[in-house]
């Protein structure tokens, strides 16, 4: 994980509230598995004040704190771990912060862990992909084909790069992501807030049930597309909350983190929180379902999955 440096102006939050939100996730995960937290040297005192003593703080210069996107994607090659180092340019130059330091984070993590890093020839982020471990990867036209990310690529060339990096052989392309994700500092359509695979291969998919919300029609389109691909779809209904202080929200239970023995899942103090818990208990049998207030994270433009990046065991 990465310790946040500041809040976004439009979030309506102060710096301390943002740091508290990130820290709550880190502390919860640390109950189940080791946690490393990258932290700008100027923020070490604030981090030490908020984080469990078991969390390993690593001083690193970084712009922002979305480790899913700026950290490496770990793969196994010839029985050894390799860190995939995607090019990062601030979600297609769509952030009020810089990104030069963040583009170097994946390589630095690989160096800290003493594993080889492979620099990719395309711009991509960890939140822009999701795999089932069986050869399938989910991608989004508005992310990988974004002209401010990869202007010289088409679906075929992007898929070739992705398959080469991840060892996948089937790409399923979503046409777009959620409406709010195109707003201000959004990612322009990351899949990790829309759909994710359960361990048994079923696909959890965000379902907005309010006809007033701009994401309402997306469910029908995706359910049909995924069914045509031969996937079993499990709807995960969106919270009843539709708007925040800015506009339509993208509150989603899809954006959770699976750790050793548990699933760390968003909570929105919403009537649908309990139904989401039940759905996740079905999707992840035998794991604790730990729900944390995620409204501050979503006000910043992401969720629990967005701020975490799993490191396979036996490394570092």
Named regions from a protein language model:
Residues 2-316:
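The feature marks the mature, well-folded catalytic cores of soluble enzymes
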């Amino acid at each position: 994980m990465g310790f946040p440096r500041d809040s976004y102006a439009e979030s309506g939050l102060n710096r301390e509230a943002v740091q508290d939100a990130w820290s709550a996730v880190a502390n919860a995960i640390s109950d189940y598995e080791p946690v490393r937290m990258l932290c700008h040297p100027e923020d070490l005192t604030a981090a030490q004040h908020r984080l469990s003593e078991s969390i390993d703080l690593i001083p690193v210069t970084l712009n922002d704190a979305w480790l899913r996107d700026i950290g490496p994607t770990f793969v196994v090659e010839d029985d050894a771990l390799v860190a995939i180092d995607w090019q990062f340019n601030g979600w297609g130059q769509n952030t009020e912060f810089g990104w030069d330091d963040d583009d170097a984070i994946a390589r630095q993590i690989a160096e800290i862990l003493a594993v080889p890093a492979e620099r990719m020839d395309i711009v991509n982020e960890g939140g822009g992909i999701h795999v089932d471990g069986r050869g399938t990867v989910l991608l989004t036209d508005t992310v990988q084909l974004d002209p401010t990310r990869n202007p010289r690529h088409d679906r075929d060339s992007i898929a070739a790069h992705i398959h080469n990096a991840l060892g996948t052989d089937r790409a399923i392309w979503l046409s777009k992501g959620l409406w709010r994700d195109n707003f201000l500092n959004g990612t322009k359509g990351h899949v990790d807030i829309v759909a994710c695979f359960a361990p048994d291969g079923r696909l959890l998919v965000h379902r907005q049930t309010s006809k007033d919300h701009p994401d309402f029609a997306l469910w029908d389109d995706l359910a049909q597309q995924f069914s045509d691909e031969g996937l079993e779809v499990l709807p995960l209904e969106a919270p009843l909350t539709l708007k925040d202080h800015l506009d339509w929200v993208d509150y989603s239970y899809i954006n959770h983190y699976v750790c050793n023995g548990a699933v760390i899942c968003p909570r929105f103090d919403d009537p649908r929180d309990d139904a989401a818990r039940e759905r996740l208990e079905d999707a992840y049998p035998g794991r604790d379902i730990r729900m944390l207030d995620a409204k501050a994270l979503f006000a910043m433009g992401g969720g629990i999955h967005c701020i975490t990046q799993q490191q396979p065991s036996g490394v570092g």
